[in-house]
């Protein structure tokens, strides 16, 4: 099971997911593809939830998600207790996500990184290991916070267009 990765994407991440799925198989990984299976417009939380649930349940040890930026996938996956998703756009961040944060889900942006760089990021993440030590103390604090407030909080939403820079006449939306 150590060499098994659940993958998922929305329509914006579909082409990169397919490339990375082939890369994983070439590297000897078993791949659990949880969708999407086309360029048709879909909602990223549906696929992030599937992959995050597979990781959190122990069905697979690792997950990889791709959307336009990787951000929405990371936000969604991190709502699932036990998931530590990191959005990475370079190999160094991917290594540190595993070494220091024990990230078990990697997210990337199909509109941010090309296939070659995405393979380097994925390789760096898969080959890294959690260092433990002082980092274990920190991840334990994350887990304690998750247990204390997980599922009971209601995040506030910003109104469309705000907060943020002033918007008005002559400004792009």
Language-model segments: residues:
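A short beta-strand-loop structural module common to alpha/beta enzyme folds
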Residues: 30-41
